A protein has these predicted regions:
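Bacterial Sec-dependent N-terminal signal peptides
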Residues: 1-30
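Acidic Gly/Asp/Thr-rich repetitive segments characteristic of extracellular carbohydrate-active
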Residues: 29-68
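Extracellular beta-strand-rich, repetitive "passenger/adhesive" scaffolds
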Residues: 37-38, 58-59, 83-93, 106, ...
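Predominantly extracellular beta-rich ligand-binding scaffolds that present long acidic/polar faces
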Residues: 108, 117-119, 137-139, 149-284
Length: 352
């Protein structure tokens, strides 16, 4: 049984470890965020940190394990590091409502957002994050935004196929599972879309559910792209002037064989295709590792595997930030000895 005392000591120990390991430069400073004032963090929210004159561009903010904050805005160029997500052994910090990122060159890593994310400046990086809803710009200009190793529960949307306002986005090593009636990834100009699993499970043909829609000038390679069976003819929809190569995708063979010859066409919907492509075993997103006889094995450019667990930025289950320690076991003594309580913790380092 996990006690309040155990949680309190574990959070405090992890916070100390994060500050020890997290400092990146001599000048930049590190700050803890925790909505629980009894944890004695530097700030109770990201918003409070942004309002402080002490927090400067280049600083790093760490979300304490178990921290829960709502509707946050990043208005300074900082690095925000979370705890990863949904690990049974480690308390998750998360942001409810939404996260708006308004400062260019901001990096957000290992953060769980239960709502939307607005990317409202250029050169933003989201890495190892979980976003349960959608991602778009909310009307802002945001060039060269990168999404790496992220788990997205709805869609990613730019501002159009000829708009420089969302030029040059990169989506790599991600798992994107949308049930939306439009594209799971859509309205992008000159993007790089590589080594992802992108699904659109919406079944009605009244609309245009697609894995990729309205993409111009893109490089699209080494992905697994799946649609529902009755919409498999539109897995790629309005994709123009793009290099589409070495992907595994659900499709109508009569249409795709000629249009996209350098790809593997599965005349199946996602429900039938997933057990063919993926192992479908293990916990959490490990189910999307390739099956031993998967058609995606070695099917990518240069003989690489397709899908999110291959390539230069392979997906990381639970989204733990690289180089950050996390505790997987904590034991608190049941009896004080000489006024002291014995606490034992097993701490691991995320090394991939």
């Amino acid at each position: 049984m996990t006690t309040k005392t155990q949680n309190r000591h574990s959070a405090a120990a992890m916070a100390a470890l994060l500050l020890v390991f997290g400092a990146s430069t001599a000048n930049a400073r590190s700050w803890r965020i925790n909505n629980d004032e009894t944890k004695k963090a530097n700030f109770t929210s990201i918003n409070a940190a942004m309002s402080s004159e002490d927090v400067q561009a280049g600083d790093t903010l760490y979300l304490d394990p178990g921290c829960v904050i709502a509707s946050q805005t990043i208005s300074k160029r900082i690095t925000l590091i979370g705890t990863g997500y949904l690990s049974k052994a480690h308390p998750t910090a998360y942001i409810t409502g939404g996260l708006s990122i308004k400062a260019a060159n901001t990096k957000v890593e290992g953060v769980y957002c239960t709502g939307y994310v607005y990317v409202q400046a250029s050169y933003i990086i989201l890495e190892r994050c979980k976003v349960d809803s959608y991602i778009h710009t909310n009307g802002a200009t945001a060039q060269y935004v990168s999404f790496r190793q992220c788990l997205i529960g709805n869609y990613i949307e730019g501002k159009g196929t000829t708009s420089n306002e969302t030029l040059g986005w990169t989506i790599e090593g991600c798992i994107i599972r949308s049930g939306y009636s439009d594209g799971s990834v859509r309205s992008l100009y000159n993007p790089i879309i590589r080594n992802n699993y992108i699904l659109n499970s919406y079944t009605s043909t009244t609309y245009s559910p697609s894995a990729l829609r309205k993409i111009t000038g893109g490089l699209i390679e080494n992905n697994v792209l799946l649609n529902a069976k009755n919409t498999r003819a539109q897995t790629l929809w309005d994709v123009e002037n793009s290099t589409v190569q070495r992907n595994v995708m659900s499709c109508d063979e009569t249409k795709y064989a000629a249009t996209y010859p350098d790809n593997i066409c599965l005349d199946l919907g996602y429900a039938e295709a997933e057990p063919v492509v993926f192992a479908k075993t293990g916990e959490d997103m490990n189910i999307y590792r390739l099956a031993d006889d998967s058609p995606a094995k070695g099917a990518g450019v240069g003989g690489e595997d397709c899908g999110p667990f291959a390539g230069a930025m392979p997906f990381v289950v639970y989204g733990r930030p690289y180089g950050i320690p996390y505790w997987i076991e904590s034991q608190v003594g049941t009896r004080a000895i000489d006024g002291k309580v014995n606490i034992k913790q097993k701490v691991m380092m995320q090394n991939d």
